[in-house]
């Protein structure tokens, strides 16, 4: 037996075959990798008895006829041109009616290129019947076409300003009657056209200025209260109580009374006092110097008391109204000449607001405030 084994091993390759069988084969040296990278590994085909072998293992668990049928159905549905499902939101069942919120505009199909085929953006929704029959869907204002706006929308609103109502002589009602004449005088200063009623009142204004100057201006004499005011100021600066004040005290007295004379005015005043009055001023000279200044200051200051005094000068019989004859007589005294009857009637007509032919105190105040 030993000889048989030895004879068997004498065959070429028997020893290497035996080593492979026993697992003691020599190790192979690692082969060098090619430049293109590792070669793909070859997988040995499975043995004939393996479970994955055969055509049945290559297909899925679904039968081949069923998979082909489902694919054909999907391709036919895509080729039929059916509506795609929306990308956003759930799919809507075509059998259900679409719901619309009250007041919203329904969708309209796109119009063709013909302008005559265009329709309004929205039409009033019909009244719903059934369970919702009591509810009426009203269209919103923005859904109405522009041509359907009512004609009342073009009318002015009640809050829009209306032209002021004008009364007699072109005066605005509810305003002072003096404003109409003042506006006409401003228009004349700008060169605008002046109404005829305002131009007729101009002669009255020219006659009124001398009256105001005589009653309240510098042409009048000092009132007793004004003389008493000057006397108190003179006594305050008469230090030695001899009835005279010097030039320096006169300047201080003027500043105390509210007059601010310049240095040049004080020099001229002192020269006049030294030359004509011996360097001292008594009360009469003081009134002569300060009277015109006091009258010039109060010339434009007309109060209610002064207006009542002037009204009494016109109202000679004291009945509270100025008649045509009283106005003619007062103007004759103030102006120094007789005024014609026609001119007096024009003055009364311009001043008389209630049209009774006479002038009361209220109308007189409005006349004087022009």
From Swiss-Prot:
Residues 1-198 are annotated as: Disordered. Ca(2+) 3 binds at residues 352, 354, 356, 358, 363. Ca(2+) 1 binds at residues 238, 240, 242, 244, 249. It is found in: Cytoplasm, Cytoskeleton; Cytoplasm, Perinuclear region; Cell membrane; Golgi apparatus. A lipid is attached at residue 2 (N-myristoyl glycine). Modulates calcium-dependent activity of inositol 1,4,5-triphosphate receptors (ITPRs). Inhibits agonist-induced intracellular calcium signaling. Enhances inactivation and does not support calcium-dependent facilitation of voltage-dependent P/Q-type calcium channels. Causes calcium-dependent facilitation and inhibits inactivation of L-type calcium channels by binding to the same sites as calmodulin in the C-terminal domain of CACNA1C, but has an opposite effect on channel function. Suppresses the calcium-dependent inactivation of CACNA1D. Inhibits TRPC5 channels. Changing residue 315 to A: Loss of binding to ITPRs. Ca(2+) 2 binds at residues 315, 317, 319, 321, 326, 353, 357, 360. SUPFAM superfamilies: EF-hand. Homodimer; when bound to calcium or magnesium. Interacts (via C-terminus) with ITPR1, ITPR2 and ITPR3. This binding is calcium dependent and the interaction correlates with calcium concentration. An additional calcium-independent interaction with the N-terminus of ITPR1 results in a decreased InsP(3) binding to the receptor. Interacts with CACNA1A (via C-terminal CDB motif) in the pre- and postsynaptic membranes. Interacts with CACNA1C (via C-terminal C and IQ motifs). GO terms for molecular function: calcium channel regulator activity; calcium ion binding; calcium-dependent protein binding; enzyme inhibitor activity; nuclear localization sequence binding. This is Calcium-binding protein 1. Retina and brain. Somatodendritic compartment of neurons. Calbrain was found exclusively in brain where it is abundant in the hippocampus, habenular area in the epithalamus and in the cerebellum. Its main location: cytoplasm. Changing residue 354 to A: Loss of binding to ITPRs. Phosphorylated. The phosphorylation regulates the activity. It is a lipid-anchor. It comes from Homo sapiens (Human). The keyword Cell division does not apply. It holds the Pfam family EF-hand_7. CDD domains: EFh (cd00051). GO terms for cellular component: cell cortex; cytoplasm; cytoskeleton; extracellular space; Golgi membrane; perinuclear region of cytoplasm; plasma membrane; postsynaptic density. Residues 50-61, 68-84, 148-157 have a biased composition (Low complexity). EF-1 binds magnesium constitutively under physiological conditions, EF-3 and EF-4 bind calcium cooperatively and EF-2 binds neither calcium nor magnesium.
